[in-house]
């Protein structure tokens, strides 16, 4: 087995400035002086950095691979262990360098896809007598917990170290692959399960360190020799400055763990390079523990440091370059992991036996010489035993065979032990015995298993606690929603109650209004009945009045008959008086004719004519009296109309007084009004009596005047004689004609005036009767006092009766309102009871529904717990993946595959039967 000391290959790559740096005013601060040197000119420091190779912003993915990684693939196929990992701040392009934009993009794919393709290309182009098997595994270190990305349910795997296997992850799923596409499928599956998140520096920032492990075993089928090489492809999470990334919450916790593990990596590199440390802290972080062989051990390591050229990230760029400079000074001791063939073992055995025989002969010669010397004798110099000239050199058969390969389980002699001082710098200063070391490793593995078990239990408890908290939060949210819904329902119920109460109040008001209207209707009905009764009374009084009027008409007719007895026309145009006047005129004409004929007028005729003239004078006087009485009757009619108007006004005032409640002041006012009306009526009656007396005196004077006129006419007749009569015959005739016309008009008016006179006489009789009654009532003071006392008692009784009626009606109304309120309250109680029953039923339904949902959630939780426990405890949790993926798929060189090997992996689809939900996916893997 060959061993060679080599340094870590460090390659620096600078990406172009991104949008954030340009918007922040960043300027390029890096200049490239050659293919391996760059100069940084920043505010903090200036200087040049030299690495194995420096790539500027315009480099391609293929340039990185051809210079940096392609030799590493050849070393893996030659039986060496190899490591390629990218280091740098977040957003510096590590994942882009390792994975690229897409696996299927020939130009944009990164280092890992190109390595896979190069491996299978080299296998197919190798010799036909070499048989290869390729295994891959994919894991991430998230929050200092190792998680299998191909079996995400295994999220807390322990790190073990054994003498034969070295450092490895226990329980990590390894999949046999036979083609590039199968490896790509595994990478896609694992990449989808990887944790990523968005920060201010990167939209899809890796929140974990991912490690993709490729193990290649090769065997020479002719000689039986074997080699194995293991390649670690590490995509480190970027170091973060919280002020720039804006991390908070879970992202901040992830950043803390990332920076802690990167700090542990820096401490390991410092311990390996300072030359003073007696202890290398590999166990401070699971990342450094897994990469223990890659840092100062049995591995050929390539470090790609990714940097930003902008002044915005100058501090991070300087830190990354200094990290690369320190890592470059680490010395690894890579060895070929070889397994010897039987022929080589026989050859080594023969050589060992020859050496043993030589040693035994040499020992015998030395012992005999020593005995001589001890016996006090001297051995001649020429008889001294010569020094052993046999050169003990290790066999070089392993290095001379054509590309041998080691199996997965290495022999103790095939690898350097981890703590050996000669193999790695910084191992413990006190070496352990072989047995002590094995016991130490065994004890360490047990403790690691216990720690992993306890961490799994703690993680399960934390997960259960988190789920319980989430469930509690969900329940609280549900409770808050129910509370809000309850408050909303309560508010709606209160609104409905207010509306109901408002409607009830409006209903009560409407009912009270209806009751008031009913009362008003009853009052109006009573008033209507009273009005009807009054109408009946008025009809009765009208009948009585009509009877009185009939009696008055009868009296009027009788008086008219008496008054017009002397003027009865008996249906003709002229009455008896008119005919008498006409006869007198005719007789006067006859006498005029006799006198004109010259005949003597008989004295009897003159006497008869004189009597008729006297009678005619009476008629004239009567006509004048009738005319005067007509004028006086007009005045009396006007006065009567005024009296009737005053009487009607008094009656209206009396009705108004009766229609309202009378107080003592009202009573006094009524008494005053009655006294005033009586006094006014008495004054009117007295005035009327005086006027009638004056009329009588006037009539007497007129009668005397008429008598004087009659006497004068008589004298004139006597003095004039027949000559006068004959001279004035024609004039008298004309006067008689005029008198006849006037008489007709006077007779027409006479009848009307007689009617008025009769009416006035009747009214005068009634007034006299009323006046007499007033006089009688005014004279009876005792009776008036008694009537006043009775009226007061009647008024008091009426008032008390009215108050009692009002109180009774008010009490009836209050009783009716109270009954309605009681009925409304009972109805409201019944409605509230029904609403309470409905709400209780709804609450019971909601509780039942919630219990069903809670039971379903608990069932799903138990099922998830049972499924995760089955996935961790048995291989059945891996599905068909654990069966097909663990079947070796040997590959032959020369472009031919071993019979039975397939180009596809049908068990990949069953790798993750229950893919985790809400996992952040990587932008490097585009599902095809």
UniProtKB/Swiss-Prot annotation:
GO cellular component: cytoplasm; kinesin complex; microtubule; microtubule cytoskeleton
Cysteines paired by S-S bonds: none
Biological-process GO terms, alphabetical: cytoskeleton-dependent intracellular transport; microtubule-based movement
SMART domains assigned: KISc (SM00129)
Regions of compositional bias (Polar residues) in chain numbering: 905-928
Location of the region described as Disordered in the Swiss-Prot/TrEMBL record: 395-434, 893-928
PROSITE patterns, alphabetized: KINESIN_MOTOR_1, KINESIN_MOTOR_2
Coiled coil spans: 343-866
Residues at which ATP binds: 88-95, 238-245
Keywords tagged on the record: ATP-binding, Coiled coil, Cytoplasm, Cytoskeleton, Microtubule, Motor protein, Nucleotide-binding
Pfam families the UniProt entry points to: Kinesin
Bias type Low complexity, positions: 395-409
Superkingdom of this protein's organism: Eukaryota
Gene Ontology molecular function, alphabetical: ATP binding; ATP hydrolysis activity; microtubule binding; microtubule lateral binding; plus-end-directed microtubule motor activity
Subcellular localization: Cytoplasm, Cytoskeleton
Kinesin motor domain span: 7-330
InterPro entries: Kinesin-like_fam (IPR027640), Kinesin_motor_CS (IPR019821), Kinesin_motor_dom (IPR001752), Kinesin_motor_dom_sf (IPR036961), P-loop_NTPase (IPR027417)
NADP keyword on record: no
Summary of the function given for this chain in its UniProt record: Kinesin is a microtubule-associated force-producing protein that may play a role in organelle transport. Its motor activity is directed toward the microtubule's plus end.
Family of this protein: Belongs to the TRAFAC class myosin-kinesin ATPase superfamily. Kinesin family. Kinesin subfamily.
Notes on the domains: Composed of three structural domains: a large globular N-terminal domain which is responsible for the motor activity of kinesin (it hydrolyzes ATP and binds microtubule), a central alpha-helical coiled coil domain that mediates the heavy chain dimerization; and a small globular C-terminal domain which interacts with other proteins (such as the kinesin light chains), vesicles and membranous organelles.
Protein name: Kinesin heavy chain
């Amino acid at each position: 087995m060959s061993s060679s000391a080599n340094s870590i290959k460090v390659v620096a790559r600078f990406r172009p400035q991104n949008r954030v740096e340009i918007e922040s005013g960043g300027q390029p601060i890096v200049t490239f002086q050659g293919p391996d040197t760059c100069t940084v000119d920043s505010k903090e420091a200036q200087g040049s950095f030299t690495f194995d190779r420096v790539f500027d912003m315009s480099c391609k993915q293929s340039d990185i691979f051809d210079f940096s990684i392609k030799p590493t693939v050849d070393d893996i196929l030659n039986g060496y262990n190899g490591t390629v990992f990218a280091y740098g701040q977040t957003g510096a392009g590590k994942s882009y360098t390792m994975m690229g934009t897409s696996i299927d993009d020939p130009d944009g794919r990164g280092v890992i896809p190109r390595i896979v393709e190069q491996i299978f290309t080299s296998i197919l182009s190798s010799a036909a007598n070499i048989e290869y098997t390729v295994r891959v595994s994919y894991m991430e270190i998230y929050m200092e917990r190792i998680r299998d990305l191909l079996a995400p349910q295994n999220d807390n795997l322990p790190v073990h170290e054994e003498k034969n296997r070295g450092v490895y992850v226990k329980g990590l799923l390894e999949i046999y692959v036979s083609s590039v596409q199968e490896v790509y499928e595994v990478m896609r599956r694992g990449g989808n399960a990887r944790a990523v998140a968005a920060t201010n520096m990167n939209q899809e920032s890796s929140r974990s360190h991912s490690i993709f492990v490729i193990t290649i075993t090769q065997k020479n089928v002719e000689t039986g020799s074997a080699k194995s090489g293991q390649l670690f492809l590490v995509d480190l999470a970027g170091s973060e400055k919280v002020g720039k990334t804006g991390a908070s919450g879970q992202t901040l916790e992830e950043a803390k763990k990332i920076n802690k593990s990167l700090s542990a990596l820096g401490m390991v590199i410092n311990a390996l390079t300072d030359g003073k440390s007696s202890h290398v802290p590999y166990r401070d972080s699971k990342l450094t523990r897994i990469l223990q062989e890659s840092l100062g051990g049995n591995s050929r390591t390539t470090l790609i440091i990714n940097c930003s050229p902008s002044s915005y990230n100058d501090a991070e760029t300087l830190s990354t370059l200094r990290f690369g400079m320190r890592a470059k000074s680490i010395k690894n001791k890579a060895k070929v992991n070889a397994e010897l063939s039987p022929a080589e073992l026989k050859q080594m055995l023969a050589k060992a036996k020859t050496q043993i025989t030589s040693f035994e002969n040499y020992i015998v010669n030395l012992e005999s010489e020593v005995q001589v010397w001890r016996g006090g004798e001297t051995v001649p110099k020429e008889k001294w035993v010569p020094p052993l000239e046999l050169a003990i050199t290790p066999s070089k058969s392993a290095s001379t065979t054509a590309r041998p390969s080691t199996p997965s389980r290495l022999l103790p002699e095939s690898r350097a032990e981890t703590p050996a001082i000669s193999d790695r710098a910084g191992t413990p200063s006190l070496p352990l015995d072989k047995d002590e070391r094995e016991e130490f490793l065994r004890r360490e593995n047990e403790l690691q298993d216990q720690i992993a078990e306890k961490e799994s239990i703690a993680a399960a408890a934390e997960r259960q606690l988190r789920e319980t908290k989430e469930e509690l939060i969900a329940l609280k949210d549900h409770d808050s929603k129910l509370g809000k819904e309850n408050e909303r329902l309560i508010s709606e119920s209160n609104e409905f109650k207010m509306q109901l109460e408002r409607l009830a109040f409006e209903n009560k008001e409407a009912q009270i209004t209806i009751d008031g209207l009913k009362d008003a209707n009853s009052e109006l009905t009573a008033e209507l009945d009273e009005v009807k009764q009054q109408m009946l009374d008025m009809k009765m009084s009208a009948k009585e009045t009509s009877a009185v009027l009939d009696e008055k008409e009868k009296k009027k007719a009788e008086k008219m008959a008496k008054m017009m007895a002397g003027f009865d026309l008996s249906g003709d145009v002229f009455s008896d008086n008119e005919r008498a006047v006409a006869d007198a005129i005719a007789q006067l004409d006859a006498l005029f004719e006799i006198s004109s004929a010259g005949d003597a007028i008989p004295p009897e005729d003159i006497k008869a004519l004189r009597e008729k003239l006297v009678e005619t004078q009476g008629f004239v006087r009567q006509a004048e009296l009738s005319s005067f009485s007509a004028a006086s009757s007009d005045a009396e009619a006007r006065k009567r109309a005024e009296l009737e108007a005053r009487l009607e006004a008094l009656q209206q005032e009396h009705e108004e007084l009766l229609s309202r409640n009378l107080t003592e002041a009202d009573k006094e006012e009524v008494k005053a009004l009655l006294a005033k009306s009586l006094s006014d009526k008495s004054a009117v009656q007295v005035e009327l009596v005086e006027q009638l007396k004056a009329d009588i005196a006037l009539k007497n004077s007129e009668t005397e005047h008429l008598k004087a006129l009659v006497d004068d006419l008589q004298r004139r007749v006597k003095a004039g004689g027949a000559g006068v009569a004959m001279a004035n015959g024609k004039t008298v005739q004309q006067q008689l004609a005029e008198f006849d016309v006037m008489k007709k008009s006077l007779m027409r008016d006479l009848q009307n005036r007689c009617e008025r006179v009769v009416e006035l006489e009747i009214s005068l009789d009634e007034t006299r009767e009323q006046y007499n009654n007033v006089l009688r009532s005014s004279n009876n003071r005792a009776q008036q006092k008694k009537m006043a006392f009775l009226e007061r008692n009647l008024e008091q009784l009426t008032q008390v009766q009215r108050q009692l009626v009002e109180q009774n009606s008010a009490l009836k109304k209050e009783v009716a309102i109270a009954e309605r309120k009681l009925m409304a309250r009972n109805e409201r109680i019944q409605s509230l009871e029904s609403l309470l029953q409905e709400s209780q039923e709804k609450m019971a339904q909601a509780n039942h529904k919630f219990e069903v949902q809670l039971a379903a959630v608990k069932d799903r939780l138990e099922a998830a717990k049972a499924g995760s426990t089955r996935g961790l405890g048995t291989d059945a949790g891996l599905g068909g993946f654990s069966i097909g993926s663990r079947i070796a798929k040997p590959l032959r060189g020369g472009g031919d595959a071993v019979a039975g090997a397939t180009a596809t992996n049908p068990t990949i689809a069953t790798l993750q039967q229950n893919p985790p939900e809400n996992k952040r996916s990587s932008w490097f893997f585009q599902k095809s």
